[in-house]
Amino acid sequence: MGFWAKLKEKLTKKTNQVEQDEPILDQQDQQDQQEEQEQIIEKEIEQIKENKIKKTKTSETKKQEKPIETLKEKKKREKQKEKDKKVEKAMLKSAFNFSKDIKKLSKKYKQADDEFFEELEDVLIQTDMGMKMVLKVSNLVRKKTKRDTSFENIKDALVESLYQAYTDNDWTNKKYRIDFKENRLNIFMLVGVNGTGKTTSLAKMANYYAELGYKVLIAAADTFRAGATQQLEEWIKTRLNNKVDLVKANKLNADPASVVFDAIKKAKEQNYDLLLIDTAGRLQNKVNLMAELEKMNKIIQQVEKSAPHEVLLVIDATTGQNGVIQAEEFSKVADVSGIILTKMDSTSKGGIGLAIKELLNIPIKMIGVGEKVDDLLAFDIDQYIVHLSSGFMQGDEVEK
């Protein structure tokens, strides 16, 4: 079995499996569970009546029985499949262009030579993954195809090299997940330039955790941009159905650190699970921004030394290499722990996340795949690589 087949099998299993560490249940889930138990009992009673036999099940027959899939498990599995379809749809443009170019190479070259690798590097450059990542992937492919230079092997080696270059051979990918933990106040700060979808992403993230049953508070600490707080208020009222709470300043240009202080105080006193902090997006004045972030960090660390648990930089995927520059600049003024890559559904060059990971060692944590409130998803490198390469690995045409 080749690498791509193994990766696809892993993704399929992951999509179908039910995680054991499920977050706390909301009231609807609890009600569903109760109804489900009642239905199971009723079915068992009916079975006994029909057979007119009370059969005692031995431990052996119990082992042989197929486990009943609970309603909650079924809902989770269906949600996971729905998320995978969203990612696949969001990557159609990137996958189409990438697969089309790889297929052109497969028709032109039957075996790999220096000229082939030059053209392969040109194709990789077009994905916006950056020159450093391009050379890394190209060199990995060369090493993996020394003995077998057939194009079938080259394609599989390309998929493995893309995966290996991003994950450093970590098959579990655990270190790339959002650092959210139970039984603590999780504090996440979002940074990024105006226009990238920072405030929208924050609202969607609030919805993401509120839907899982967590108590979420937002600190509107972008006191510089007119309309930033109003945007959050509108989101909370009209699209989040007031499921989350907000702490805001009394006036424009107020000290953002004071908003953070008030938010932390409220979050601690009222036992919130998550505090999301919106920040100003003006990178042009790095001195002021750095001072603001340092002041916020001091206030946060007075309460929790390990916080903020995430500093997430929001990057617009359609900006290409300009997004890489933004990541470089923000990493100078903030301890960025992860990337939220927005507008993945609007770009035909989906490699910017690979470029940032290679250049700055900052992983993608979440991706925006549409305009709906639930279109912010946890990033999964398995999904990304499978969908990016499925067009040329399966031999099927990827539709636009």
Curated annotation (Swiss-Prot):
Catalysed reactions listed for this entry: GTP + H2O = GDP + phosphate + H(+)
Keyword Iron in record: no
Compartments (UniProt record): Cell membrane; Cytoplasm
Enzyme type, top EC level: hydrolase
Entry superkingdom: Bacteria
GO MF annotation terms: ATP hydrolysis activity; GTP binding; GTPase activity; signal recognition particle binding
Full protein name: Signal recognition particle receptor FtsY
Species per Swiss-Prot/TrEMBL record: Mycoplasma mycoides subsp. mycoides SC (strain CCUG 32753 / NCTC 10114 / PG1)
